[in-house]
């Protein structure tokens, strides 16, 4: 058993969470559980952890699954005609995606994305009801973790609003795209910019199906590209 925690390497709290986790484990009498840092800044070395292509692809697919779920669930649930129908549909597809990611049917990623968007797009909702849309922004863990933000999405929906959450993948795209600014304005290496742009292409390739299906849907908007957001 081990805990893997990402570290950004910057000055925000995301760099320091790993230290708090280790301290919490020690205080709980579970100091034997290792906490592995996942970072691209060389903060810690983890010789026992190897990022294989299969692991990286699975991680990217998991992120896209989560982003698509947030996009379709938060869009449809506030307007559902049958209470609980959106959550039931989410629970069904969640298990399908878990089975896919854990290797039971890894090649079904494209088919699953198509099915998720199709089924949520057909979910019965009140088409005449309009609610204020409230965007959620902020520090990355607090933004995406319900337990860290006191279940903000649930609160907004109870108060009669529709929550809008940006994609987690966009954070990685921003980090990769930022290497261009560092090269052009801060004197960083060109190699970093090249690698960043290659990462953008790889990430966009993974969510290509999601973007295409969202564009064809009636109720959802596709993700904006990082180049457009940067402008």
Residue locations for each model-derived region?
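An N-terminal assembly and electron-transfer interface module characteristic of large anaerobic redox
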Residues: 1-231
């Amino acid at each position: 058993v081990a805990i893997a925690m990402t570290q950004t390497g910057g000055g925000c709290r995301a760099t320091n969470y790993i230290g708090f986790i280790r301290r919490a484990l020690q205080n709980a009498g579970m100091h034997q559980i290792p906490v592995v840092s996942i970072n691209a800044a060389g903060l810690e070395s983890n010789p026992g952890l190897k990022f294989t292509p299969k692991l990286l692809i699975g991680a990217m697919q998991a992120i896209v699954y989560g982003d698509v779920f947030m996009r379709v669930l938060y869009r449809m649930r506030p307007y559902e005609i049958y209470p609980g129908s959106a959550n039931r549909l989410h629970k069904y597809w969640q298990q399908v995606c878990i089975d896919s990611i854990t290797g039971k049917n890894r090649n079904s990623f494209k088919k699953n994305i198509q099915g998720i968007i199709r089924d949520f797009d057909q979910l019965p909702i009140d088409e005449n009801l309009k609610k204020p849309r409230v965007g959620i922004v902020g520090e990355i863990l607090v933004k995406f973790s319900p337990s860290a933000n006191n279940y903000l999405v649930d609160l907004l929906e109870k108060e009669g609003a529709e929550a809008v959450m940006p994609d987690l993948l966009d954070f990685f795209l921003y980090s990769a795209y930022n290497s261009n600014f560092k090269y052009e304005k801060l004197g960083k290496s060109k190699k970093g910019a090249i690698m960043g742009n290659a990462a953008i292409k790889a990430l966009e390739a993974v969510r290509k199906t999601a973007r295409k299906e969202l564009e064809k849907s009636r109720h959802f908007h596709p993700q904006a590209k990082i180049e457009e957001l940067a402008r």
